[in-house]
Design a protein with these regions (language model features):
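Conserved catalytic/dimer-interface elements of ABC ATPase nucleotide-binding domains
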Residues: 30, 39, 91, 159, ...
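Tandem CBS (Bateman) regulatory domains
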Residues: 1-4, 42-68, 75, 79-83, ...
Length: 263
């Protein structure tokens, strides 16, 4: 787990919370009263807040965590709870009777632990854990359209398509960092920003035949939550883990990889 995580108080402004999520690259921030856990705020929560409503406090948008754990709980049990709750991390408190926040444990933390212990996954190759029929966006889509698609589907990252080939990835973090959350819908931007302006390209990608462990290692190395699964990739010579373009087959997430180990 990550001990002593950055927290915000219940009366912290959403503007401050947004800057923390943007500047520190956090996916989630615990909300506390003193050191007592009250709730959490995720990037998804921030995306649902209008850019003009900066006077809202953290208590107004925080949600009760779906999973709360304690330091002594077995890591495999926590992993199953996180997967079943469809989340990527959980706050860690001192005990069931003491809600003092002591850390955060994420899917990435658990995967790193499994790799360090050289535990073998139950599914062996990427193709076995790949999700097909992927939700995508086009390189020339306005960010407002992608924002709506992420909000409607619950996906925090989408492959970017141009001429039927994947050329990049765009995530909630990219949109938050761009400063264009909701602005185009509220008249704050005269000319809508398009996906190609902020997407990450060339994307890190993987093929179906690769080992699940390889996917886990790439996710940890690049601190990414999902990998496009591709066919006929055109690799970057200096960075062979990235592709200039490829045919999109599916996508594999950290949760898919974790499920390959513990389900």
């Amino acid at each position: 787990m990550t001990p002593n995580p950055v927290t915000v108080s219940v009366d912290t402004s959403v503007t401050k919370v947004r800057s923390i999520l943007r500047d520190e690259s956090f996916r989630c921030v615990p909300v506390v009263s003193g050191k007592h856990l009250e709730g959490t705020i995720t990037r998804g929560d921030m995306m649902r807040i209008s850019a003009t409503k900066s006077n809202i406090e953290a208590r107004g948008i925080m949600e009760h965590p779906k999973v709360i754990t304690t330091p002594e709980v077995d890591i495999s049990k926590i992993g199953k709870q996180i997967i079943n709750a469809d989340i990527i991390q959980a706050p860690v408190v001192k005990s069931e009777d003491d809600m003092t926040i002591v850390g955060i444990i994420s899917v990435a933390d658990i995967l790193e632990n499994l790799l360090d212990k050289e535990i073998k996954p139950k599914k062996h190759n990427v193709g076995e854990a790949t999700t097909r029929n992927v939700v995508t966006c086009n390189y020339d889509d306005p960010l407002s359209k992608v924002w709506d698609k992420m909000d409607d589907t619950g996906f925090s990252g989408l492959p970017v398509i141009k001429k039927k080939k994947i050329i990049g990835m765009i995530t909630r973090k990219d949109i938050i960092n761009s400063g264009h959350i909701r602005l185009s819908k509220e008249g704050g931007v005269k000319k809508p920003t398009k996906v190609e302006a902020i997407m990450k390209t060339p994307p890190v990608a993987i093929t179906e035949d690769k080992d699940i462990k390889e996917a886990a290692k790439l996710m940890i190395k690049y601190n990414i939550g999902r990998l496009p699964v591709v066919d006929h990739p055109v690799h970057i010579k200096k960075e062979p883990e990235r592709v200039r373009e490829a045919e999109l087959v599916g996508i594999i997430t950290r949760e898919d990889v974790l499920g390959s180990y513990i389900n």
